Amino acid sequence: MRILLSNDDGIHAPGIQTLAKALREFADVQVVAPDRNRSGASNSLTLESSLRTFTFDNGDIAVQMGTPTDCVYLGVNALMRPRPDIVVSGINAGPNLGDDVIYSGTVAAAMEGRHLGFPALAVSLNGYQHYDTAAAVTCALLRGLSREPLRTGRILNVNVPDLPLAQIKGIRVTRCGSRHPADKVIPQEDPRGNTLYWIGPPGDKYDAGPDTDFAAVDEGYVSVTPLHVDLTAHSAHDVVSDWLDSVGVGTQW
């Protein structure tokens, strides 16, 4: 199995380093990751400037000022030959649950892999300690995929409780929960009297029902949520069409 491995925490982050070491025990792994933390970069792509890379002695490649999406795009189309069999993103330091997936560079890297036609996995740890647990779960999933490919055309967003492996209760297939909208902005003043702004923490959980990713991780289970790239709200087509007719917009042209 040939794996393109990326993340959004940066190439030196403990999550990606722990996972790369574990994956190399049974797979051919090429790391292509940002040279610094790009958390929250979502699906952003660098278009107004060139991208430089640096290759370490072990073959890992850092993309200078690159986003997670840049890294996967370059990895698939230029840096990994032959091309990968699968794109893996993580292990993220902290969860990507519910609405987090909208902003997550970890999920975005996997989404870019899927957009380019490859199976893709995004892996996050609900904490900052037991990266070895998340690595073991990821390896088990990838070994399963090598035995029997999952033909859903979906991204798997995996969130792992920050627990020793022996304390993991199992795996649940979940849906994304949701949070209350975040609204906290933290102003600060710099030495010259200018106001600086920090974006505050995410909102509290709003929908954390028993079938959500929030509930699974809180209860000690690995959450596996299938995600897809198509953002079309197919069920709303008729509603929107009827609305356009009712307000007279749909008949103007």
Swiss-Prot record:
Source organism (scientific name): Salmonella arizonae (strain ATCC BAA-731 / CDC346-86 / RSK2980)
Cofactor annotation: a divalent metal cation
EC number annotated for this UniProt entry: 3.1.3.5, 3.1.3.6, 3.6.1.11
GO cellular component term, pick one: cytoplasm
Record-given protein name: 5'/3'-nucleotidase SurE
UniProt remark on cofactor binding: Binds 1 divalent metal cation per subunit.
InterPro entries, per database record: SurE, SurE-like_Pase/nucleotidase, SurE-like_sf
Gene3D superfamilies: Survival protein SurE-like phosphatase/nucleotidase
Keywords, alphabetical: Cytoplasm, Hydrolase, Metal-binding, Nucleotide-binding
Lineage: Bacteria, Pseudomonadati, Pseudomonadota, Gammaproteobacteria, Enterobacterales
Residues where a divalent metal cation binds: D8, D9, S39, N92
Functional note: Nucleotidase with a broad substrate specificity as it can dephosphorylate various ribo- and deoxyribonucleoside 5'-monophosphates and ribonucleoside 3'-monophosphates with highest affinity to 3'-AMP. Also hydrolyzes polyphosphate (exopolyphosphatase activity) with the preference for short-chain-length substrates (P20-25). Might be involved in the regulation of dNTP and NTP pools, and in the turnover of 3'-mononucleotides produced by numerous intracellular RNases (T1, T2, and F) during the degradation of various RNAs.
Subcellular location: Cytoplasm
Family per record: Belongs to the SurE nucleotidase family.
Superkingdom, natural source: Bacteria
Substrates-to-products reaction catalysed: a ribonucleoside 5'-phosphate + H2O = a ribonucleoside + phosphate; a ribonucleoside 3'-phosphate + H2O = a ribonucleoside + phosphate; [phosphate](n) + H2O = [phosphate](n-1) + phosphate + H(+)
Gene Ontology MF terms: 3'-nucleotidase activity; 5'-nucleotidase activity; exopolyphosphatase activity; metal ion binding; nucleotide binding
